[in-house]
Amino acid sequence: MSLIPKKGTVYVVDDDEAVRDSLQWLLEGKGYRVRCFESAESFLSRYDAREVACLIVDIRMAAMTGLELQNRLIEARSPLPIVFITGHGDVPMAVDTMKKGAMDFIQKPFNEEQLVGLVERMLDHAKDTFADYQLSVSRDALLSKLTLRE
């Protein structure tokens, strides 16, 4: 029997410890596995693309911003659904993230019920796309082993 909740993993990346702690408390209380990171770099070093998950990320952080993290995930062809949270967002920034595939862009302080509903939708989306992603990775690995003649 697995100790990991059936609902999936929620990654939280925010440089504000209070935000990370409150999101972890809220989401673990709803049965989600939550993994928090204070920077995009620490998230990238420990992100496991083999699990059904979603990402809640602050748009503005010190070293690597949420937008830069989104771009890195796009380059890696990650299927990870993303929602951006911010205390200082603007319309062009929100539009940019959505055009690049973010599922939502919400302002702090956020409505807890809205956020939990959004996490549920993101994880449903992740479950739907996860099998396709794994198949794509397996196919690419097999194709890379072929010689030019094959």
Regions found by a protein language model. Give the residues of each.
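Acidic catalytic/metal-coordinating carboxylates
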Residues: 38-39, 64-69
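The C-terminal output helix
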Residues: 120-134
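Conserved acidic segment of CheY-like receiver
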Residues: 4-19, 23-27, 40, 55
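Short hydrophobic/Thr-rich beta-strand motif most characteristic of the beta2 strand and flanking loop
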Residues: 31-38, 42, 46
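Active-site beta3 strand of CheY-like receiver
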Residues: 50-57
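The feature encodes the CheY-like receiver
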Residues: 20, 62, 86, 90
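C-terminal output helix
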Residues: 90-92, 106, 110-119
